[in-house]
Regions:
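Hydrophobic, aromatic-enriched interface-forming segments
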Residues: 174-220
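Active-site nucleophile-adjacent alpha helix/oxyanion-hole segment immediately C-terminal to the catalytic cysteine
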Residues: 35, 40-176, 231-237
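Solvent-exposed loop/turn segments at secondary-structure junctions
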Residues: 95, 102, 243-246, 284
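The N-terminal extracellular segments of secreted preproproteins, especially immediately downstream
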Residues: 20-23, 94, 303
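Active-site-adjacent substructure of cysteine-protease-like catalytic cores
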Residues: 211-273
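Non-catalytic membrane-recruitment/adaptor modules and adjacent regulatory linkers
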Residues: 150-182, 187-190, 237-242, 271-277, ...
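Cys-His-centered catalytic/binding microenvironment captured across papain-like cysteine peptidases
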Residues: 252-259, 268-311
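Bacterial Sec-dependent N-terminal signal peptides
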Residues: 1-32
Length: 311
């Protein structure tokens, strides 16, 4: 095959692929505008409390042999009463799943509680557009994770994190798609940026506006101004280099890649410093950093907005 023909073939192939993707995107957009039922499910903490307090005791599940029902119910109630207490666990790669948990626990805790109880009783359940049916390895693993801090005694969170990691796959999971003991701290559990945004859309039906990449910083001139504006319209998730944010010795070389998701709760700026308040799984954090360092650590900005009406 000569070079001219080879170039022509690959150019045509790329054009067809781009055209097909464009068609899919336009079709999806049109559907969103015409479907009156395409809204984000919402409920209140009071709704969830009234529901969960009617349940005094759970029987053991035939599907989750290592999950103690009394601890499972206790964990659910803790998440509903104090949603910011949810914790990814020590030495795990569950941070992406912990971060997205902010959405159901704050905006649809009743939907979350019903899903978790159905998953416990039936071994499978549907959340939003996603049908979750965990593998046999996950059914056996939940309730057995050890040396993960408070996650050791929070089996509902173990079920939630393991099921999400088992169901959703991104390119970072390509070489390890099936769970083996200890995989909660390997690439099996990792969450790349596109995978995170896809989970928020499919599970909770949010409109997600994104800027960023896995390996490059977003090209935004006024990063602080952009993020401040996005906070006025929705919940902002920052995808950042956690090693840089928390390193103690600033002369230590660190890999310049993002590893962590945080929920931004507040942001302000003076001439020399930017102050961030954010949820970092288990507690609120407050950090003051320079604008240059702020730009250095951020790789992705996702603004997640509830679909409440259609224009």
């Amino acid at each position: 095959m000569n070079n001219n023909f080879n170039f022509s073939f690959h150019t045509s192939y790329k054009f067809i692929l781009i055209a097909f993707c464009s068609c899919c995107i336009n079709t999806a957009t049109a559907f969103y505008k015409t479907d009156p039922n395409d809204t984000t499910p919402v409920s209140t903490q009071k709704d969830a409390i009234l529901f969960i307090e009617k349940i005094k005791q759970l029987e053991s599940s035939a599907y989750w042999p290592n999950v103690k029902p009394e601890l499972f119910l206790k964990n659910l109630k803790e998440n509903i009463y104090t949603p910011l207490s949810l914790y990814e666990g020590s030495n795990t790669n569950f941070c992406g799943y912990a971060a997205l948990s902010y959405f159901p626990l704050h905006d649809d805790p009743l939907g979350y509680a019903k899903f978790m109880l159905e998953l416990f009783y039936k071994g499978k359940a549907k959340f939003g557009k996603v049908f979750i049916q965990p593998s046999s390895e996950i059914l056996k693993a939940a309730g057995t994770l050890k040396f993960k801090g408070i996650l050791d005694i929070r089996p509902a969170d173990q079920v939630w994190f393991l099921c999400l990691a088992d169901h959703f796959k991104g390119y970072v999971n390509f070489f390890n798609k099936h769970y083996d003991e200890g995989d909660e701290n390997t690439f099996w559990a990792s969450v790349n940026y596109a995978k995170f945004n896809r989970m928020v859309k499919q599970l909770f039906n949010y409109a997600v506006n994104t800027r960023g990449y896995d390996l490059m910083h977003p090209h935004i001139n006024d990063l602080y101004g952009y993020i401040s504006d996005k906070m006025k319209t929705g919940t902002v998730v920052l995808y950042l280099n956690n090693a840089e944010l928390y390193k103690k010795k600033h002369n230590t070389l660190r890999p310049a890649t993002p590893t962590h998701y945080i929920i931004l709760l507040g942001i302000s700026r003076t001439e020399e410093m930017i102050t961030m308040t954010y949820w970092d799984y288990g507690f609120r954090s407050l950090r003051q950093i320079t604008p240059a360092f702020f730009k250095k650590i951020i790789f992705g900005i996702s603004c997640c907005t509830k679909k409440l009406s259609h224009e």
